[in-house]
Amino acid sequence: MKPTQDSQEKVSIEQQLAVESIRKFLNSKTSYDVLPVSYRLIVLDTSLLVKKSLNVLLQNSIVSAPLWDSKTSRFAGLLTTTDFINVIQYYFSNPDKFELVDKLQLDGLKDIERALGVDQLDTASIHPSRPLFEACLKMLESRSGRIPLIDQDEETHREIVVSVLTQYRILKFVALNCRETHFLKIPIGDLNIITQDNMKSCQMTTPVIDVIQMLTQGRVSSVPIIDENGYLINVYEAYDVLGLIKGGIYNDLSLSVGEALMRRSDDFEGVYTCTKNDKLSTIMDNIRKARVHRFFVVDDVGRLVGVLTLSDILKYILLGSN
């Protein structure tokens, strides 16, 4: 039975009120409120070798780490998978300099990124006592899925790295604490928040170096893998690249995506899908229950039609539809 105009209007009003309520909630909380009672934080010194920092990330199953400059006693940026991908691209384009890779330190990344003409290490940060809404805005502005929380010692005035806040943790915090998410009943296809145009995809036979270029050029964290008929079958993530580097594959990136996935770790979290008819209430419930980083949007038979990222969801909650 088709919904009446009155019922559609009621759903629309309820959704708008729910979004406004969630915004007020985000303004009333600070980043401290989101942090667990106890947690572990790994901070890397900028003098550390890049290959050693890679092992630290992989051994601890993390995708980023704050950097600390011990010479200046200051926060020096956030190391992410993007930085390692930049290293791969640099040595792939400059094979004559490949012998230097084992000597590369983290503070040398800026030279590589400058040579490539790509963004430098992300140095955006926020004080943990600022409103959560403000932290969300800063993440959207820097086009990053995470932001370091930097405090200051009251006596010495030295910076203190408190933690790294992620979009996933914020949205899960909202899903756990805001019952208003149950009123987000408008289908996501009607909200204009799905990325559909110019979305890159690959196939199992696509060379990994081509996918790496898609990741950097599109500034995305994953590329969906489809078959010859457009059906979604898997995803290649930026994190998967780290496993290749650990295996020493810096300059032999002609191997296919299918071959690369054979090296994927067993703790892969899987591919999450939805349709245009799904509602944000359902999406938020999934975020509450599982560690989700994106939803690939498929049609009724499983063909890929778009992607809904955590950034898309956060942007809608903060700023409304596009």
From Swiss-Prot:
Give the GO biological process terms: autophagy; cellular response to glucose starvation; filamentous growth; peroxisome organization; positive regulation of gluconeogenesis; regulation of carbon utilization; regulation of cellular response to glucose starvation; regulation of glycolytic process
Instruction: Describe its function.
Output: Adenine nucleotides-binding subunit gamma of AMP-activated protein kinase (AMPK), an energy sensor protein kinase that plays a key role in regulating cellular energy metabolism. In response to reduction of intracellular ATP levels, AMPK activates energy-producing pathways and inhibits energy-consuming processes: inhibits protein, carbohydrate and lipid biosynthesis, as well as cell growth and proliferation. AMPK acts via direct phosphorylation of metabolic enzymes, and by longer-term effects via phosphorylation of transcription regulators.
Q: What is the effect of changing residue 293 to E?
A: Decreases SNF1-activation efficiency
What did gene disruption experiments reveal? Leads to a decrease in the length of G1 with respect to the wild-type strain along with a smaller difference in the cell cycle length of parent and daughter cells.
Q: What is the effect of changing residue 251 to I?
A: Leads to resistance to 2-deoxyglucose
Cellular component terms, GO, for this chain's entry?
A: cytoplasm; cytosol; nuclear envelope lumen; nucleotide-activated protein kinase complex; nucleus; plasma membrane
Q: What else is known?
A: Present with 11700 molecules/cell in log phase SD medium.
Residues given in the record as ADP 1 binding sites: 42, 146, 166-169, 291-293
**Major localization class:** nucleus
Subunit structure and binding partners: AMPK is a heterotrimer of an alpha catalytic subunit (SNF1), a beta (SIP1, SIP2 or GAL83) and a gamma non-catalytic subunits (SNF4). Note=Interaction between SNF1 and SNF4 is inhibited by high levels of glucose.
Query: Which InterPro entries does the record associate with it?
Result: AMPK_gamma/SDS23_families, CBS_dom, CBS_dom_sf
Gene symbol of the encoding locus: SNF4
Record note on what altering residue 291 to A does: Decreases SNF1-activation efficiency
**Which residues are listed for ADP 2 binding in this entry?**
195, 221-222, 309-312
A single GO molecular function, which one?
protein kinase regulator activity
Q: What is the annotated localization of this protein?
A: Nucleus; Cytoplasm
> What is stated about domains?
The 4 CBS domains mediate binding to nucleotides. Of the 4 potential nucleotide-binding sites, 2 are occupied, designated as sites 2 and 3 based on the CBS modules that provide the acidic residue for coordination with the 2'- and 3'-hydroxyl groups of the ribose of AMP. Site 3 can bind either AMP, ADP or ATP (AMP, ADP or ATP 2). Site 2 binds specifically ADP (ADP 1) and is likely to be responsible for protection of a conserved threonine in the activation loop of the alpha catalytic subunit through conformational changes induced by binding of ADP.
Would you identify the family this protein belongs to, as annotated? Answer: Belongs to the 5'-AMP-activated protein kinase gamma subunit family.
Q: Which Gene3D superfamilies does the record associate with it?
A: CBS-domain
Task: Using the record's annotation, list all stretches that form the CBS domain.
Answer: 37-97, 118-181, 194-253, 262-322
Q: What is this protein called?
A: 5'-AMP-activated protein kinase subunit gamma
Binding-site positions, AMP: 195, 200, 221-222, 309-312
Q: Which UniProt keywords apply?
A: ATP-binding, Carbohydrate metabolism, CBS domain, Cytoplasm, Nucleotide-binding, Nucleus, Repeat, Transcription, Transcription regulation
Residues the entry annotates as binding ATP = 195, 200, 221-222, 309-312
